[in-house]
Amino acid sequence: MNQRHLWTIVALSVTVLGTPAVGRTQTTKATAPAQQILASDAVKVGEFQSSEGKRTSDAVITSIHPHNLGGRRAATLFIRKIPVLTFVSSNPVASVETKVGAIGDNEGVQPYALNTEKSVQVASLGNLADARIQNRSQNDDPVKRASLVAAKINQLIRDNVKADQITVSWKGADSSLVASQSQNKSSSSQQKSERYTIKVKNQELVEINQNTRLADSTNNLANDALQATNRLRRLVGNASPLKEIANLPARSPKRSSNPIANLPQRIASSIRLSFQGIASFYGRGDGFAGRPTATGERFNPEAMTAAHRSLPFGTRVRVTNTRNGRSVVVRINDRGPFTRGRVIDLSTGAARVLGMIGSGVAPVRIEVLGR
């Protein structure tokens, strides 16, 4: 009898202890599919979900390089490793010391040279509406302003928007306090700043003004706006360049002590001399980077500069690759080329814009715009 009770107790114990094990096994089996679903929904940084639910890679098209420019915070927007726009804060940097990761501009080196280690990569910002949510107190942050434009550009390329829908027009004058450029640094004068708008399908992409300019600025907002637009048209979809700015009002030739610098003008009307020949480029692995040019400034391969045998230093010329129609405005700051049959030696950055890196040389048309 006792032995029968003992076996009964053992059987009940096995039954009770075995039940949780089965429960755990069933729970594990039920959880596994949920884990698989979560894994399939995960998207890595730099990738996005397509409309079919397939995961596709979104290459890094834009990058933002923060730096200091004239004592102010700045950020240069690169598209496909080519500098396009520079955003500058309206207020000077509080500290005079150069921060870690910032580039000073006291040695003649262009401050927007691409440094991939210190650049902010903008591969995919997801929902563009989220990128527009910004604190008003941060609107002066050049990196945030550049990031918003970069997000829009990435979205345009993702949506296969036609680049010929990128246009530029005159927006009008904006009354703003601009620090005087005279030696009296404490004074400020009320000036009307010209503004231009770059649009895509009649929606503003970016405004060109005193604090948002072409990366290699021509010191003329009209020229900056037109060149930035044409650079965007080419880099987004290889569209042909525009010849002039829309809605540009007629201006009287006099009313300013420096009308060339202050009044917008059509680039074509400022051509003083033109000629053709073969262009080459330098600064790519040849040891010239950082060395003094004929003007004494240090050579920056990514700056929009060029060498010519006789044009005065500081002269700006528009160089057009006659093979593909691409053009760029460069500043003469060096002497050369000294190879027979070549008329101009471009920086690596300018050559990249013209699409002649692979060939090394290209037939070009050169138009002298003045200084």
UniProtKB/Swiss-Prot annotation:
Residues 1-25 form the signal peptide. GO terms for molecular function: lytic endotransglycosylase activity. One of its GO terms (biological process) is cell wall organization. Residues 177-196 are annotated as: Disordered. CDD domains: DPBB_RlpA-like. Its EC number is 4.2.2.-. It comes from the Bacteria. Gene3D superfamilies: RlpA-like domain (2.40.40.10). Keywords: Cell wall biogenesis/degradation, Lyase, Signal. Residues 177-191 have a biased composition (Low complexity). PANTHER family: ENDOLYTIC PEPTIDOGLYCAN TRANSGLYCOSYLASE RLPA, ENDOLYTIC PEPTIDOGLYCAN TRANSGLYCOSYLASE RLPA-RELATED. Belongs to the RlpA family. Lytic transglycosylase with a strong preference for naked glycan strands that lack stem peptides. NCBIfam families: rlpA (TIGR00413). This is Probable endolytic peptidoglycan transglycosylase RlpA.
